[in-house]
């Protein structure tokens, strides 16, 4: 069946009365915890986030530090959520809250527990620390509620037990629930957006900008604009004329773009729960607070590799491929350096991995341009039991290194991550001690 024919059939169904989100349709709720980090900080202080100017940021880093969150009260003043500290007008007085990532994770876990009182974990997909999707299709009849009433029930429970305000989107698929929350909920008094395929086309086919829509970035928006396409309706109509040029431009991603233009989403909650990636990886990355020289950045690469190896060892995993990514000060307009090195066989040996990453760094890094971002990634990770050791491996040396790694891990688990350090971790350029006290690159 063509897209056009499918659209015409659904249009006829709606004419016969099938256009609303009803009990016999899939019903997805997408819930977002409003200005989550900032709201948590307000709750902890007994303040109202809708009446309090509060910023979650670490001003000790620099005045260019990006705010992790601001309260709705500050958004109402026209201040952007992900602004930098120096971009906040001097006339605006506000409270600065240092990030407390562990606290936010604790709140998020508590809220997840609230959801579990109403639905099974198999019907919840945690999208981020402050956002989740819930398939309530099989619960509406049980609770004698509509999908919107179910959303209200969950939002009220979160508010009553944590003090955190939420917004929600209700849709007939994952995509529509997300869009209902991201776009529609902002313009309704109860902060609950509702969409099905038909109301989506009626309400949002002319919506601008395209970058407001999930998974459409500024580059895609700009590329489409070059062809006179500025709305989802434009994409849908273009797909009716000819899909080929969209596939030539975006490859396989064109299928998702076209589906979303029509309000379709083939991925279901069960697909997410049953998905298992064929390849797994572990990574460690950080943004540096100033330009690092070639030698200083090598210290950081070693520290990150140390932590990555220990993570592999602790989880009983090995890697057979390592990738290093280096980005430079944007003022130099220097393209990022990236390289990958393969190991002879899967390993979590500190020496083998460190040697491989160091050599890769020496090969790809620019020695004369300030370095600002680094990421080390262990690719193709697999359980250690799958590894076949070579006849050329030295069993005594291997055992010695494993015993050392095990001892280091035990000490760190018992006394803290900074209990054992290399001498280089005490250098002024080192970020090792500070990073070990963070969660996700921010203060715990």
Model-assigned labels for residue ranges:
Residues 2-129, 133, 259-261:
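Residues that scaffold, gate, or flank divalent-cation-dependent active/transport sites
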Residues 5, 40, 338-339, 343-444:
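Acidic, metal-coordinating catalytic segment for phosphate/diphosphate chemistry
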Residues 30, 212, 222-368:
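DNA-contacting surface of Y-family translesion DNA polymerases
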Residues 40-42, 66-69, 176-184, 247, ...:
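Short acidic, glycine/serine/threonine-rich loops at helix termini
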Residues 127-131, 171-174, 317-321, 369-373:
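Short Gly/Ser/Thr- and Asp/Glu-enriched loop/turn motifs at secondary-structure junctions
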Residues 134-155, 228:
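Catalytic palm subdomain of template-directed nucleic-acid polymerases
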Residues 150-208:
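Long, highly charged, low-complexity intrinsically disordered interaction regions
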